[in-house]
């Protein structure tokens, strides 16, 4: 590795970028905790425990430059042997959401249920609803009646809009790594953060802890 590259990787994030990373992770953790505190309408814990990774996109807003679409920031956390790893930072754009998602701000949660979906996340641009099957995720007690759903779908998707949380068939959405922020905070790309199963540093650990709290294997 050239000396310049070694120096680049050793640099610490600036206070501003560290604050950005912590803010993204904490917003994702807040949304996830709020969703899971309503057991009858929450994501079944067995599905969280069986997921390869979880994507949380808080406060995704309408984007005037995307017809019918939205844009926002996401965190992606992979399940590891010890629990849940460090959050990698991504962007979301596009999407065909239908009339049910008409609010100015919407939260999204995606469960990546298999290795194929996980590999997709490691690409430079991952289009949901492409080669990896996506389905509206079951909530609460619906899980027992939806066992076959997880066998067919690589991704289970959910949305929360105006206080209503439900599964939604999310399609036409592109998730791309925010490698400016990943490199600034970790000195690594999103792919490296996810592939290397990094432990979450304390300032961005809230989402990993929340996922551990609500996971059942």
Question: Across the structure, where does each feature detected by a protein language model lie?
Answer:
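Small-residue-enriched, tightly packed secondary-structure blocks
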Residues: 6-217
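N-terminal export/membrane-targeting signals
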Residues: 1-5
């Amino acid at each position: 590795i050239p000396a310049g590259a070694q120096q680049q990787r050793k640099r610490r994030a600036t206070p501003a970028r560290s604050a950005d990373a912590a803010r993204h992770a904490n917003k994702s953790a807040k949304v996830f905790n709020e969703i899971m505190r309503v057991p009858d309408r929450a994501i079944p814990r067995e599905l969280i425990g069986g997921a390869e990774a979880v994507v949380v996109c808080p406060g995704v807003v309408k984007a005037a430059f995307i017809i019918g679409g939205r844009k926002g920031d996401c965190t992606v956390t992979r399940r590891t042997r010890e629990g849940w790893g460090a959050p990698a930072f991504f962007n979301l754009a596009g999407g065909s959401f239908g009339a049910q998602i008409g609010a100015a701000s919407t939260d999204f949660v995606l469960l990546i249920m298999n290795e194929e979906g996980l590999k997709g996340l490691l690409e430079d641009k991952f289009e949901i609803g492409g080669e990896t099957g996506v389905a509206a995720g079951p909530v609460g007690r619906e899980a027992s009646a939806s066992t076959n759903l997880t066998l067919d779908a690589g991704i289970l998707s959910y949305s929360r809009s105006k206080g209503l949380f439900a599964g939604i068939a999310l399609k036409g959405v592109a998730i791309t790594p925010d490698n400016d922020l990943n490199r600034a905070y970790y000195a690594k790309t999103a792919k490296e953060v996810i592939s290397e199963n990094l432990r979450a540093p304390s300032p961005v650990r809230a989402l990993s802890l929340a996922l551990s709290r609500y996971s059942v294997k």
